[in-house]
Amino acid sequence: MTTLFISDLHLTPSRPDITECFITFMRTEAKNAEALYVLGDLFEFWVGDDDKTPFANQIRTEFKALTDQGVPVFFIQGNRDFLLGERFCKETGITLLDDVCTIDLYGTKAVILHGDTLCIDDVEYQKFRKTVHQPWLQWIFKRIPWYLKKKIVSKVQSDIRDDKQMKSLDIMDVNQSEVEKVMSQNCVNLMIHGHTHRPNTHFFDANGAKNTRIVLGDWYTQGSVLQVNSDGFELQNRPFNT
């Protein structure tokens, strides 16, 4: 059996090629998996669980079909879908995990997370993240009419794009010391995350041991899937239909 990991799909109605690749993935290899982990940024931006647009319902349907077949699906919120909550999970049968979570992968303990919390050199983003994760602010936002939330989110998206253009690539990558700290705190030698859109496997010595950090890829130009089984792991691409 194989456990699958994906992240940073950034699903949106304006990119039907990504959606088509995702649906194909869900209806073929995902249905044969032992488990599926989605490590954040499934959506380009998730306004709230009250989103009942045809597109949102289409994605709900795919997850519900998969969990109904007995495949467990686990979800960690990303920086673009941190408002995805228990209502969505109840409707689809998926399980919402903590921001940082440890799991057993065929006898190897691993820590999994979206990855944005590792980018501590981006001080402004970390301040923004701390603000939008305030429970009182989310409580208020969830009670705003959906159409108004959509307008607010569109403005935030525009500001984020402008902000990214002003930042260096190094600042938006993970901080190695923070990586080692999180791995040490969780007593693991394997980390899996997304967020940075820099798919790769990093091997390094730290905390008196050999460590591995696997970075999942984004789905902007092709799909990216991490396959893990008892024999090891492989980070693979999935081409879009042309």
UniProtKB/Swiss-Prot annotation:
It is found in: Cell inner membrane. Substrate binds at N79, R80, D122, K164, K167, H195. Hydrolyzes the pyrophosphate bond of UDP-2,3-diacylglucosamine to yield 2,3-diacylglucosamine 1-phosphate (lipid X) and UMP by catalyzing the attack of water at the alpha-P atom. Involved in the biosynthesis of lipid A, a phosphorylated glycolipid that anchors the lipopolysaccharide to the outer membrane of the cell. Mn(2+) 1 binds at D8, H10, D41, H197. One of its GO terms (biological process) is lipid A biosynthetic process. It catalyses: UDP-2-N,3-O-bis[(3R)-3-hydroxytetradecanoyl]-alpha-D-glucosamine + H2O = 2-N,3-O-bis[(3R)-3-hydroxytetradecanoyl]-alpha-D-glucosaminyl 1-phosphate + UMP + 2 H(+). It comes from the Bacteria. Belongs to the LpxH family. CDD domains: MPP_YbbF-LpxH. It comes from Vibrio parahaemolyticus serotype O3:K6 (strain RIMD 2210633). Coiled coil: none annotated. HAMAP family: LpxH (MF_00575). The gene is lpxH. Its cofactor is Mn(2+). Mn(2+) 2 binds at D41, N79, H114, H195. The keyword Hydrolase applies. Binds 2 Mn(2+) ions per subunit in a binuclear metal center. Signal peptide: none annotated. Pathway: Glycolipid biosynthesis; lipid IV(A) biosynthesis; lipid IV(A) from (3R)-3-hydroxytetradecanoyl-[acyl-carrier-protein] and UDP-N-acetyl-alpha-D-glucosamine: step 4/6. Keywords: Cell inner membrane, Cell membrane, Hydrolase, Lipid A biosynthesis, Lipid biosynthesis, Lipid metabolism, Manganese, Membrane, Metal-binding. This is UDP-2,3-diacylglucosamine hydrolase. Its EC number is 3.6.1.54. It is a peripheral membrane protein. One of its GO terms (cellular component) is cytoplasm.
